[in-house]
From Swiss-Prot:
Its main location: membrane. It is found in: Cell membrane. CDD domains: DMQH. This is 3-demethoxyubiquinol 3-hydroxylase. One of its GO terms (biological process) is ubiquinone biosynthetic process.
Length: 214
């Protein structure tokens, strides 16, 4: 349904539904299967399993933050084409959310207990970015996706050699994050200041340190 055909109440209800789906585990259907070459679950030691679960919890939290960011930006973006771009990217990343949840379940673990907090903070940041300007909003997305790609590549390097399953999931996510970055830049995203990029990285590091354990 086109954005312009929705009433304010409809848009609010749709936003609440999207928020709940982002923070409630296993509430989203995946439109694509896990991007893995085998259904075999790799054997991991207890220590390895805990470490991989910590990494996947970080990645799941990152996807929750991405949902909040995109939803917030779509809520305040001034241009309907930008709103549509934000919503399309958010919908594509729902699969990432589901893939991380699935792998966490396979590892006998769970998402971060602070998931609602991460979503709320990200929604607020996205809404502010969207209200400033389309160029800033899209630049914020581009920088976010670049930093997400960095930590995905770092996590791939930390995985146990036998955990090809997690590696393939993260590799597919990384490829799509970079595509979303290029899409944001192609739609007019502006480069952020060094201070802004540093602040975003600092906040992301705090999130990762917390989500790994909780």
């Amino acid at each position: 349904m086109a954005l312009r055909s929705l009433s304010k109440i409809d848009q609010l209800l749709l936003g609440v539904d999207k928020a709940l789906r982002a923070v409630v585990p296993h509430s989203n259907p995946s439109t694509r299967p896990l991007p893995v070459s085998s259904d075999e679950i790799p054997e991991l030691s207890i220590t390895e399993s805990r470490h991989v679960a910590g990494l996947m919890r970080i990645n799941h939290t990152g996807e929750v933050c991405a949902q909040g960011l995109y939803h917030g930006q779509a809520f305040t973006a001034k241009d309907n084409s930008v709103k549509r771009a934000m919503q399309q990217s958010a919908e594509e990343e729902v699969d990432h959310l589901v893939w991380c949840e699935t792998r966490l379940s396979e590892l006998g673990s769970h998402p971060s207990v602070f998931t609602p907090l991460w979503y709320g903070m990200s929604f607020g940041l996205g809404a502010v970015a969207g209200a400033i300007s389309n160029e800033f909003s899209l630049g914020f997305v581009a920088e976010t996706e670049a930093q997400v790609s960095e930590h995905l590549q770092d996590h791939i390097g930390q995985l146990p050699p036998q955990d090809q399953r997690s590696k393939e999931i993260l590799a597919q996510m990384d490829s799509e994050e970079l595509h979303h970055r290029e899409l944001a830049l192609a739609n007019g995203g502006a480069a952020l200041s060094p201070l802004m990029r540093h602040t975003m990285r600092w906040m992301a590091n705090r999130m990762k340190a917390t989500a790994y354990h909780f």
